[in-house]
Amino acid sequence: VDTIMKDKSFGEAGEQLVIEEFLEGQEVSVLAFSDGNTVLLMDSAQDHKAALDGDKGPNTGGMGAYSPAPIFTDILRQKVRDTIMLPLVRAMKSEGRPYKGILYAGLMLTKNGPKTLEFNARFGDPETQPLLVRMESDIVPLFEACIDGTLDQHELQWKTEPSVCVVMAAEGYPGSYEKGKEISGLDEARALPDVVVFHAGTKTK
């Protein structure tokens, strides 16, 4: 507090502090389709943000994720749908701003139940990668249903096998790191069964 308010480490932005409850538990990412009325939840996923193994090092945008998340039971799933996702969509509709598209909720599963950390109007990264490789449903009709308001006519089908996404980042990430280094071994990785290579922040020459 002294660093922020007395030493002015954040300038004028540090003149006011908001103190909130520290939530303990496991984080889980819940993604859903919405057509403004209906909410269709995707399967669960958990990402890991710490840069190093053992949940150590600085936080990142995500060093990996897996789906499904064993901690996210069917009972929890129904509770999240009924008490968090649906009320949000209904409230936006009542305000004349119906939400159509992807909803991404970051939740903390506490001893007192799921608590909302954040909402995003987008897919989660890297949670989406293991989710989409497990999804058997065609995603295009789902997007169309979000637009047309016919999401209640759809169900999602999933592969039973779990999926894991591992992020390969440059040394030094999320701090300063060298750019332009060649990435090798991708052809060999693609040749492995059940392996998909996704790109982010890369280019080909």
Map each language-model feature to its residues.
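Active-site "cap" helix and flanking loop/linker of ATP-utilizing ligase/carboxylase catalytic domains
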Residues: 81-103, 120-192, 199-204
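Internal nucleotide-binding/catalytic subdomain
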Residues: 1-130
